[in-house]
Amino acid sequence: MAPPPVNSGDAAAAATGEKSKLSPSGLPIREIPGGYGVPFFSPLRDRLDYFYFQGAEEYFRSRVARHGGATVLRVNMPPGPFISGNPRVVALLDARSFRVLLDDSMVDKADTLDGTYMPSRALFGGHRPLAFLDAADPRHAKIKRVVMSLAAARMHHVAPAFRAAFAAMFDAVEAGLGAAVEFNKLNMRYMLDFTCAALFGGEPPSKVVGDGAVTKAMAWLAFQLHPIASKVVKPWPLEELLLHTFSLPPFLVRRGYADLKAYFADAAAAVLDDAEKSHTGIPRDELLDNLVFVAIFNAFGGFKIFLPHIVKWLARAGPELHAKLATEVRATVPTGEDDGITLAAVERMPLVKSVVWEALRMNPPVEFQYGHARRDMVVESHDAAYEVRKGEMLFGYQPLATRDEKVFDRAGEFVADRFVAGGAAGDRPLLEHVVWSNGPETRAPSEGNKQCPGKDMVVAVGRLMVAELFRRYDTFAADVVEAPVEPVVTFTSLTRASSG
């Protein structure tokens, strides 16, 4: 028996319906899985899971598993009540969907640096720093132009300033090696002075502000970030009450910030003078608050997190990698040369460069990216597509995106030569998936995008750290204890360069 004739109109409608369920790339469009639960109570429960009962990575992995491997999910993000008015986000947990957050035409990043809450502007002299401005804001380009010009003009000071900081830091490590020596504390102490020397020159804050300069800087950072900090206060119920329930009052760090600001007003006077002559349209006091933020939050805060992670991975890799790095460094800059390691020299060290990029892939200094959808859009993961509505908060957890097994072989492992052409696990084309700087490593920051204006300086400091370490030492050993934000690294032995 012949089948009934098909009405051409019905067939066309069916075909149109099928097409409407596919994304432009041909992926099936699905409803975003997950949910937000009961207002107040579910965000509170999720906050406890995130900080204490599961930890950040397991918080996301467990929800991915719960929803059949979907990597675009609806979840609550801390801090939740009472600091955050709306904890609801659409989480992007794979390399493909995450890239939406790097497209400034698709996301609005005004006031999203820290996520679902905005620190009080009283912490920033009443101003909104560059990092909290959307790329479309006219002030963004004006301020970023000054910051990028500063970073470019001071790049030739980075290597000598770092060399001095490294020597002082590791002289202190060696002096304390009768017992275990914690790297993190020394790193904080010397990297604040390095940051200011590299960016502005002049007397370091440890001399002008005094020994309390680092303490004041850390207190100012803590008052911004305490809603998303954890395992700082024990027991955890007390931490919940003190750090995650209400915003700490800015007046408690007003005096310390005033001392730091006074230091930068003098140290950065030439930069501020030049900006005024260039008629940037940004008042001097506002630009000063921005320079304080760039130096302490972006630069010093980044080095505080990033360098312990580099040392962690080197410590775990052991003597075999150490020997390869020492050979490469000393072949490029012999230990007897007085000029020291330059940026041009580390550019000729492919393994050193790869180690730094791999550390940035495994542990990006800023783990999160946030942005509001500028319009209704379709977000694609590897396997499906999802409709997002205008105004929804998009969130990316970068450690999952940059360890995506569909992009990287041995994605969860530290592979030292991953970015060496012809290396064991790949080569340079993978760099576009290293996105720690709020943009691909293959792209440059500009006035019109949200990529880190100090991207090149951060990478340079990482390379100098590795190169200086293996110019001075053959190998080292250290204990590593994982902790939120950064690992605690304790040196137990250092073996001086045999040819030194």
Swiss-Prot record:
Domain of life: Eukaryota
Annotated residues for binding of heme: C452
Induction notes from the record: Not induced by red (R) light, or abrasion in dark-grown seedlings.
A GO molecular-function annotation: heme binding
Segments for region (Disordered): 1-26
Reaction equation(s) it catalyzes: (13S)-hydroperoxy-(9Z,11E,15Z)-octadecatrienoate = (9Z,13S,15Z)-12,13-epoxyoctadeca-9,11,15-trienoate + H2O
The keyword Iron appears for this protein: yes
Known EC number: 4.2.1.92
Expressing tissues: Not expressed in dark-grown seedlings.
Residues bound to substrate: F297, N298, K304, P365, V366, E367, F368
Essential cofactor(s): heme
Biological or metabolic pathway of the protein: Lipid metabolism; oxylipin biosynthesis
GO BP terms, alphabetized: fatty acid biosynthetic process; oxylipin biosynthetic process
InterPro entries xref list: Cyt_P450 (IPR001128), Cyt_P450_E_grp-IV (IPR002403), Cyt_P450_sf (IPR036396)
Keywords recorded for this protein, A-Z: Fatty acid biosynthesis, Fatty acid metabolism, Heme, Iron, Lipid biosynthesis, Lipid metabolism, Lyase, Metal-binding, Oxylipin biosynthesis
Gene3D superfamilies on file: Cytochrome P450
Similarity annotation: Belongs to the cytochrome P450 family.
Function description: Involved in the biosynthesis of jasmonic acid, a growth regulator that is implicated also as a signaling molecule in plant defense. Converts 13-hydroperoxylinolenic acid to 12,13-epoxylinolenic acid.
Protein name in UniProt: Allene oxide synthase 3
